[in-house]
Amino acid sequence: MFQMGGVGPMMGQAMYFQRIAKPNGDEEPYSIRRYVEESRRLLEVLNTRLAGRQFMVGDEYSIADMATYPWARSYFWATVSVDELDHLNAWFDRLDARPKTQEALQLPEPRPSAFGEGDIDEAAKKNAANFKN
């Protein structure tokens, strides 16, 4: 599955090196650049896939959308640009508008900073502190 073999791992690494390792004093510019660039490439693949489709597998919302959305939608947290990815951004809008998506975003607590709202730097520091050795 695209999410498990690509988007999830790459976005996860982009977030880790920027939001956990770097605030804890372990900055690795090559790793950050590598994972941000690969995450962008994968989001471009997804953007192409979404051309002419409402959802990843056609016009029906599916487990593929459910699994990929949280990772892809966290692009801001991973500092991955989604500029000019019109099909991807339209897909975000469709999924963001779903009532169950909004409900899920409140669990276990509201997390607006993950989606580019609020103070991302403060959220990153708080998150990184949970992973100190």
Regions inferred by a protein language model and the residue ranges of each:
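A generic alpha-helix propensity feature with a strong bias for hydrophobic helices
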Residues: 73, 102, 111-115
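Segments of small-molecule ligand-sensing domains
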Residues: 105
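GST-like fold's C-terminal all-alpha helical module
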Residues: 3-100, 132
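Acidic/histidine-enriched, glycine/proline-rich intrinsically disordered or flexible terminal extensions
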Residues: 108-133
